[in-house]
């Protein structure tokens, strides 16, 4: 029989494998399997709960490292709770609802699932972080947060797809959502959102509806969040509940009169080739219609152009003329073949690693 850990509400405490944590508000913690991997995941949860309930008002979180070396940040627990409350209010989560924890607890996304369970008194179902988080859970959760790869994999298997369809509130973050995946989930019955945020904002500060009649290409800031553009055209975030100071991001954005916004790409994902600045994400988006295997756009130094555009591709030999769908100035000058595209632990393209790989393969 799989264990369930029940909160003693009279004394506001929770016991996980014999260890009691005071002041917790999680309803239940359900562990659907007993494996070495799950035991390790439970240990990670216990460690986080110990850190959460110790007297310190702060804890340390780490960035994913998708654009550089991962860094440690000291954040306030009170602000994490404010972030969780903003999300729970927006999604209408309440005591007795259930949340799926299928993200690594090393990063802010996983930690915030637990904090949302704390502030909203949600039941918490554990699934070892993997590409198929729904495979072994017995009951479909009310709420889940996943990365695009987990969603894609879940759609491929009928049993997992049925569970995915039963999730009422689903957040997708940690990486770009391509057009094909967005189309595949458009008719699912639950409310599905793409998230925008970062470790510095304690996960997301804006959501974009992906399915149903309310689907939109724009991100809508959560309550209490205001956005503007810097002189460089990057998004500025003012979210006093979760950030002490306004945050200037590296994300090039476009604002709309209703306060919503779209992200065009990252300022540091620009290739300057022959004096023309190319946004990497724009090229990748255009190529998704013709490339069926994982790929990434990166660059290499060029004595004439300064930088030349390079395509890293995991598929079979690609006819160069297929790239003619791109304007001439956006076309890769080289196609380099690799077995896999470097990713961070959270599933984002690891841009520095891609540049290093291209240098090795040329």
Name these PLM-found stretches.
Residues 157-213:
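Gly/Ser/Thr-rich phosphate-binding loop
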Residues 44-62, 95-98:
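Conserved pre-ATP/AMP-binding loop-to-beta segment of ANL
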Residues 226-248, 252-254, 312-314:
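AMP-binding/adenylate-forming core of the ANL superfamily
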């Amino acid at each position: 029989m799989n264990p369930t850990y029940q909160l003693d509400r009279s004394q506001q405490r929770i016991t996980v494998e014999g260890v009691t944590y005071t002041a917790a508000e999680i309803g239940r913690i359900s562990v659907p399997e007993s494996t070495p991997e799950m035991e390790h995941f439970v240990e990670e949860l216990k460690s986080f709960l110990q850190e959460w309930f110790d007297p310190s008002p702060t804890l340390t979180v780490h960035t994913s490292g998708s654009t550089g070396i991962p860094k440690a940040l000291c954040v306030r627990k009170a602000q994490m709770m404010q972030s969780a409350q903003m999300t729970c209010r927006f999604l209408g989560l309440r005591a007795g609802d259930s949340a799926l924890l299928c993200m690594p607890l090393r990063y802010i996304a996983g930690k915030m699932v637990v904090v949302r369970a704390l502030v909203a008194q949600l039941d918490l179902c554990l699934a070892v972080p993997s590409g198929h988080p729904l495979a072994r859970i017995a009951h479909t959760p009310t709420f889940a947060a996943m990365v695009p790869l987990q969603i894609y994999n879940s759609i491929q298997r009928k049993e997992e797809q049925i569970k995915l369809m039963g999730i009422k509130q689903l957040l997708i973050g940690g990486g770009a959502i391509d057009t094909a995946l967005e189309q595949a989930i458009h008719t699912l019955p639950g409310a599905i959102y793409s998230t925008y945020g970062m470790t510095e904002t304690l996960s997301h500060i804006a959501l974009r509806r992906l399915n149903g009649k309310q689907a939109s290409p724009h991100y809508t800031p959560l309550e209490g969040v205001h956005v503007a553009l810097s002189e460089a055209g990057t998004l500025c975030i003012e979210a006093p509940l979760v950030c002490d100071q306004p945050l200037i991001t590296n994300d090039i954005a476009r604002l709309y009169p209703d306060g919503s916004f779209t992200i065009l790409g990252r300022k540091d994902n620009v290739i300057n080739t022959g004096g023309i600045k190319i946004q990497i994400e724009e090229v990748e988006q255009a190529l998704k219609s013709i490339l069926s295997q994982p790929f990434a756009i990166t660059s290499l130094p060029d004595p004439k152009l300064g930088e030349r555009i390079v395509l890293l591709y995991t598929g079979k030999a690609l006819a160069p003329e297929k790239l003619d769908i791109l304007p001439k100035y956006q076309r890769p000058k080289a196609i380099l073949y690799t077995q896999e595209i470097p990713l961070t632990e959270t599933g984002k393209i690891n841009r520095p690693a891609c540049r290093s790989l291209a240098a090795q393969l040329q």
